[in-house]
Amino acid sequence: MLTPTQQVGLILQYLKTRILDIYTPEQRAGIEKSEDWRQFSRRMDTHFPKLMNELDSVYGNNEALLPMLEMLLAQAWQSYSQRNSSLKDIDIARENNPDWILSNKQVGGVCYVDLFAGDLKGLKDKIPYFQELGLTYLHLMPLFKCPEGKSDGGYAVSSYRDVNPALGTIGDLREVIAALHEAGISAVVDFIFNHTSNEHEWAQRCAAGDPLFDNFYYIFPDRRMPDQYDRTLREIFPDQHPGGFSQLEDGRWVWTTFNSFQWDLNYSNPWVFRAMAGEMLFLANLGVDILRMDAVAFIWKQMGTSCENLPQAHALIRAFNAVMRIAAPAVFFKSEAIVHPDQVVQYIGQDECQIGYNPLQMALLWNTLATREVNLLHQALTYRHNLPEHTAWVNYVRSHDDIGWTFADEDAAYLGISGYDHRQFLNRFFVNRFDGSFARGVPFQYNPSTGDCRVSGTAAALVGLAQDDPHAVDRIKLLYSIALSTGGLPLIYLGDEVGTLNDDDWSQDSNKSDDSRWAHRPRYNEALYAQRNDPSTAAGQIYQGLRHMIAVRQSNPRFDGGRLVTFNTNNKHIIGYIRNNALLAFGNFSEYPQTVTAHTLQAMPFKAHDLIGGKTVSLNQDLTLQPYQVMWLEIA
């Protein structure tokens, strides 16, 4: 009787043979001696057992598993053999240095290509600006062909191999990525793998009954099955449609977690996995460095569950990861999981998503601004921040999406806070329905049956810049100081660095009027960017402040890595934490001066250099921070 390890080894050898069977004996002999085959075979030896185990856990009883694997690995070999030499060099470099993403040099930016630059050629022209800001990572949103009109901001993909014609061509994208690499900037794109648009060829052929695409999506003849699923599903966009299904013109029902034009893929069909792996490898060979794995929580469906965060979803992502380790190991995954904090962290791991959005820290930064109290933020940094080795948070202040209050009710309850009541307060505060609020946000997806609501708005609008609040500029700098210094990869939603306000015209566009997130998706404001070096303007003060902090971070190895230790300031308005036993960070979330007492600082050295202020401060006496002031103190 063979052991499981021996069985996997035999399958691996069989599949290697099958990959080469399509070649003539002479071709095969040459391939087997090639460096490409040596590297590919080595990576198969290392990562195929993981791939096999993950797929077996999902599809073990499906007779299509082995033939699917055979086609998948043949596809992976073709992809690797066609990968250009510079990308293969990056593959090896990142295999040898998996912590490249944790360097203090890393600073990210994210933008809509059309809104920021018009098209891909316009974006290429802005590379000198990205270098000026200090970016080493650029997330380009959204790039691919999508339906005209409503498309969830481009996240309803009609083809993963065609750029939206308004932006350019695949050739243009390849040129932009090469130019970014030349400038020392990694390219990040979205991998929207939970769903496609209803106009995707697969969707059209599945709906038409093409046997090659049978069961690529969840299509039901009537409401019997959808009604059973809906009993346990969470409504994501209740304004768009109740439940998780939409009716087709012929009366059938299709699974649409998000919008009626976004059809969920059916991963219980192993050929869907193989098809999406092919799209993933195509993107890798364009030169993409990081794939933002969209909507990771939703990819597996199971009756009687919420169909979120199921074990099979994790297994499938790990299987995609294993394919990438074999055929394009330079490419990392970034998780997008806006779920309970316990579940967010489960997607992050060297074998799953090496980096992941940090929605808890983002939400708690805004919470701390509203309450002026650091208790929830301090708790999260203490117990929920540190990640496994070789992984990192993507720390952000704003994004293209709404703000959801994703802290755990049990965490809030431990501090004597009602999670439900506190979320109601935060929603009222940030949409200016609370006395004394400085924010000018917009409600998003209010659900009257649950009371749930999220918030739209740019950082500048949410900190009070629209009404010239005297503390608005310092609030933005404070928030970004946390993102830049807590450990991991900081991400700037481009426009924030010059204080871009909401687009108040979003509701006048019929393709956007039912989605308030367009409020914080304004076009590039040329006038604001022209002011970025003028310290008499808010744009200049924000830009120069952020640029200074970025330069400090990138020049100082104390910001390397991702781990921290919280420091109790004994002041409810001041957050404190230590990085690498060498840097003590403080941030005052109050509009009044606040003090850390000498007694609290007694274990610290007598003096420390403030990297932001450029001054030496005494730590053997009370330390006062001005309203919204940040200090990064060298203590070793």
From Swiss-Prot:
Its EC number is 2.4.1.4. InterPro entries: Amylosucrase, Amylosucrase_C, Glyco_hydro_13_cat_dom, Glyco_hydro_b, Glycoside_hydrolase_SF, O16G_dom_2. It catalyses: [(1->4)-alpha-D-glucosyl](n) + sucrose = [(1->4)-alpha-D-glucosyl](n+1) + D-fructose. GO terms for cellular component: extracellular region. The record marks 452 as: Transition state stabilizer. It is found in: Secreted. Amylosucrase favors hydrolysis at low sucrose concentrations, and polymerization at high sucrose concentrations. Competitively inhibited by fructose. This is Amylosucrase. Catalyzes the synthesis of alpha-glucan from sucrose. Catalyzes, in addition, sucrose hydrolysis, maltose and maltotriose synthesis by successive transfers of the glucosyl moiety of sucrose onto the released glucose, and finally turanose and trehalulose synthesis, these two sucrose isomers being obtained by glucosyl transfer onto fructose. CDD domains: AmyAc_Amylosucrase. Substrate binds at residues 152, 195, 262, 292, 400-401, 517. The active site is at residues 294, 336. It comes from Neisseria polysaccharea. Pfam families: Alpha-amylase (PF00128), Amylosucrase_C-like (PF22582). Like the recombinant protein expressed in E.coli, the amylosucrase may be secreted in N.polysaccharea without cleavage of a signal sequence. Its main location: secreted. Belongs to the glycosyl hydrolase 13 family. GO terms for molecular function: amylosucrase activity. Keywords: Glycosyltransferase, Secreted, Transferase.
